[in-house]
């Protein structure tokens, strides 16, 4: 298998690539109606664009495995998922960063990027961890929370982190 993909990195890239175009497209759909003139609604929609494309994979065949894989790669690979996807299916993520910066004019751009990196890691880790626990049959931690409530709570946490207050 490594020969076919050229290397372990090539294999990881191919597996990530498999769904990233779809995730990017879905994020754009969710961002279409973001209106910076209505900051609270805009931040909510941005948070949904960060969570829902991944959360929707919870009900897709093989989606749970993919989510656990992305979480594992994010926290154990030599390169971050961000580096692996830079310039490939990440334009919606750049759009999210632009929108959040627009809504957080008083916050320095490096702090906006930091917050976005933290919430992205939160999304990937939390969904991956929930799926790992769920697939192992353990109903502890986040695996005890129903899917809809889990997603809603994750979106709410992201809104809280990205809100401009306290900038």
Question: Predicted regions: what is each one?
Answer:
Residues 87-167:
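C-terminal peripheral helix-coil segments that are non-catalytic and often amphipathic
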Residues 5-28, 32:
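An amphipathic alpha-helix adjacent to DNA-recognition modules
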């Amino acid at each position: 298998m490594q020969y076919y993909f050229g290397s372990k990195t090539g294999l990881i890239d191919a597996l990530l690539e498999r769904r990233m175009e779809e995730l990017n497209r879905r994020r754009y759909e969710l961002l279409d109606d973001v209106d910076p003139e209505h900051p609270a609604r805009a931040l909510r929609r941005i948070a949904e664009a960060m969570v829902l494309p991944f959360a929707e994979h919870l009900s897709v065949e093989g989606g749970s495995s993919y989510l656990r894989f992305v979480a594992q790669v994010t926290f154990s690979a030599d390169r971050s998922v961000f580096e692996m996807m830079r310039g490939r299916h990440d334009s919606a993520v750049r759009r999210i960063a632009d929108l959040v910066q627009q809504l957080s004019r008083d916050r320095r751009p490096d702090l906006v990027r930091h917050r976005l990196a933290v919430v992205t890691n939160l999304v990937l880790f939390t969904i991956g961890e929930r799926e790992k626990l769920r697939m192992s049959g353990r109903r502890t931690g986040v695996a005890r929370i129903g899917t809809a409530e889990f997603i809603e709570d994750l979106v709410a946490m992201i809104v809280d982190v990205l809100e401009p207050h306290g900038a």
